[in-house]
Amino acid sequence: MSQPAKVLLLYAHPESQDSVANRVLLKPATQLSNVTVHDLYAHYPDFFIDIPREQALLREHEVIVFQHPLYTYSCPALLKEWLDRVLSRGFASGPGGNQLAGKYWRSVITTGEPESAYRYDALNRYPMSDVLRPFELAAGMCRMHWLSPIIIYWARRQSAQELASHARAYGDWLANPLPPGGR
């Protein structure tokens, strides 16, 4: 039996201590030998990102998971800075920028609103697939495979049992993250 794919889980939450949902989701990831959990706010509280180190981490993993809350229809500021600086031209895109080609990108998002708020006729005016389009485009720019996002809607209002169920499913996926024929 082959080894599971190496997963780099980039976790970005500026107030992690207050996010029960994200803490519960992270727990199974920390127990898997094929997963490297990398807390960006813990490593870079000053926003000075070690770009060569981050690019080396990306090279060492097949699956890159971006776990974060949805902030103003995007990601927290440090993750945006990370995306802009680390996924640079010549490394991840443009001429010679093929270091991530063929790898997998998956977004794991928590929201503060119910799924019903993400429709053309609802509060946010757009479905989540439209809101996450910039991330899908970034994956394409890097020549990565875009995997369907995992979205925990209205994370604060999930019961302990619901969060545990999400965490189990997430942990099961992390243990074997590639689709059939993915390698």
UniProtKB/Swiss-Prot annotation:
SUPFAM superfamilies found in the cross-reference section: Flavoproteins
Catalytic activity: a quinone + NADH + H(+) = a quinol + NAD(+); a quinone + NADPH + H(+) = a quinol + NADP(+)
Keyword Oxidoreductase attributed: yes
Coiled coil feature spans: none
Pfam families cross-referenced by the UniProt entry: Flavodoxin_2
Keyword hit for DNA-binding: no
A single GO BP: positive regulation of potassium ion transmembrane transport
GO MF assignments: electron transfer activity; FMN binding; NADH:ubiquinone reductase (non-electrogenic) activity; NADPH dehydrogenase (quinone) activity
One annotated Gene Ontology cellular component of this protein: plasma membrane
Membrane topology: Peripheral membrane protein
Main subcellular location of this protein, as a coarse class: membrane
Entry EC number(s): 1.6.5.2
Domain of life (superkingdom): Bacteria
Enzyme class: oxidoreductase
Record keywords, A-Z: Cell inner membrane, Cell membrane, Membrane, NAD, Oxidoreductase
Disulfide cysteine pairs (residue numbers): none
Function of the protein: Regulatory subunit of a potassium efflux system that confers protection against electrophiles. Required for full activity of KefB.
Family: Belongs to the NAD(P)H dehydrogenase (quinone) family. KefG subfamily.
NCBIfam families reported in the protein's UniProt record: PRK04930.1
Protein name per its UniProtKB record: Glutathione-regulated potassium-efflux system ancillary protein KefG
